[in-house]
Amino acid sequence: MARPAVAEPGLLRALATLDHRDETARELMDDPAADLVAMDRTYHRFGPVNRIVSRPAAVYEEWVRPRLATTHAARMLDVGAGGGDLPREILRHAERDGLRLEIVAIDPDERAVRYASRHASPRFHARVATTADLVAEGETFDVVWSNHVLHHLTPAELGALLADTERLVAPGGIGVHGDIERGRAAYLGFWAATLPFAWNALAGSFIRPDGLTSIRRSHTASELAAAIPSGWRVKRGFPSRLELVWGNEIADD
């Protein structure tokens, strides 16, 4: 299994450094030479973890469902979709409600798209692409969404993503980029919640080490608020969630 580029600090040391974002920390899955078996195992086991951490049911109810109908299919874009467990979960909610939804999942990592494409369907399509590619193609979507992408980005990349999102959102649509909020409660909570599974359900995957690294790389609400252009807003949610929202129906905090 691949080793981290920077060793994961001990718990007390990590908690002591969370006042500042660690932009030098690197996730194991971002290594082009990462073990492919461990990658697949990670994608396979993301589902149960993401249902708790990323709350796709709440995303569906607040942002997606209001834009769906029975008469025509709405379009949703998932940016940096990874293995595609979250968009497929959202699609299941729409199908349960008898509402029409088509999802395009994009990721620049061929390994992620290869895994996500195993679950392709008429309403779920994964492709290797960036938001800039879709802007160039003239694509638009009713919902443009990402999960746990923001903490991977440099300031310039964040600005480009938000600018592309504004171009990709169709009239009346919404752009939502969700991520973790960095903090001691988030770090300690994930550390403790995943510890009992480190040697069984999560063994051989990158979920636990990369999850902890993600928190160290993530922003606080005030950091994101200072980094976003006019028209975007930061919303806080549970558990330790942040959402950057753009569109005509931004709810008040």
Predicted feature residues:
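A short glycine-rich, Lys/Arg-flanked "PGG" loop and its adjoining helix->strand segment in the class I
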Residues: G159-P171
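Class I SAM-dependent methyltransferase Rossmann-like catalytic core
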Residues: P32, L36-E62, R67
